[in-house]
Amino acid sequence: MSRRAKLILATLTFLFYCHMALAQNKYDAFTVKVSGKGQPVILIPGATCSGAEWDETIAHWNGKYQTHAITIAGYAGTAPMAGGPYLDKVRTQIEQYIADNKLKDVILVGHSIGGFLALSIGMDMNSSLSRIVVVDAMPFFAGANNPNAADTFSETQAKGMLDRYIKMDDQQLKASQMMITKFMCLDSSRWDMIATWGQQSDKRTMAYTMCEMLGKDIRKDIARIKVPVLVLAAYSAMPQYPQFTRESVAKTFGDQYKACTECTVHVADGKTRHFIMYDNPLWFYKEMDTFLQKNN
């Protein structure tokens, strides 16, 4: 090989790796695992959770879709973002990811904070989307039980939450996450995995993403969504809260989503808490598959 050819090859190799490095650095708000072929589905997990939350869902589809399983930066042991506003960065970078990869007729599936993000993306990108599935999330969670909840991010609240996390060692944080997990998921075989994701998450990211979601009211803004949206709401009777009924859940979610003419709310028929895909997978898959097949 001539000296000139070697120089050209070396230059092209250098440019290739520069391009790869830039592509990887472009999306510092999340990591993504892509598998399968077909219509693209972007899956966004709940707070502190890994994209592996969707492993069984992806396996259920058995290659029918091209799945893009997101893990938000800072969750479940991944490197955190340099700073906030965290959820705005995640939203804008997922939108950029859709545009950069020329994804069309995208199905968005989001759980918890991921559902809030899916709604936010749906407000911006109707032309690129086909359907949205929201798993136990609301456009203004803080306002569900508090009509006076403020539509503003509270730095004081976020710092207070972060301070509580910082004071915990790993064992204490794991115990705290386990307590929360046991309340949010009935499937005991999942408890350690979910609590470990929380323990491994960046404490600042945990505090600020949660407070950013709690401090943002998009109940009116979801009227801008022009693609069909299926909202799946969890319900499991709790004797200590007799006023908490399936009917009360349906009313709360209905009130939250009343501005969205494209939104349909379905409430689980019992023994299903926040991690619907784990507690009631048969109902979850049936509801989602029926909804997505209407797209064909």
Where are each of the predicted segments found?
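Flexible "cap/lid" loop of the alpha/beta hydrolase fold
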Residues: 132-168
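Conserved hydrolase catalytic core segment
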Residues: 103-146
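Bacterial Sec-dependent N-terminal signal peptides
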Residues: 1-27, 229, 295
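Active-site loop/oxyanion-hole signature of alpha/beta-hydrolase fold enzymes
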Residues: 69-109, 113
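Conserved alpha/beta-hydrolase catalytic His-Asp/Glu region
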Residues: 149, 165-221
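Conserved loop-alpha-helix segment in the C-terminal half of the alpha/beta-hydrolase fold
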Residues: 229-272
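Catalytic histidine-centered segment of alpha/beta-hydrolase-like enzymes
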Residues: 268, 272-281, 285
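Conserved HGGG/HGGXW glycine-rich cap/lid loop of the alpha/beta-hydrolase fold
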Residues: 34-80
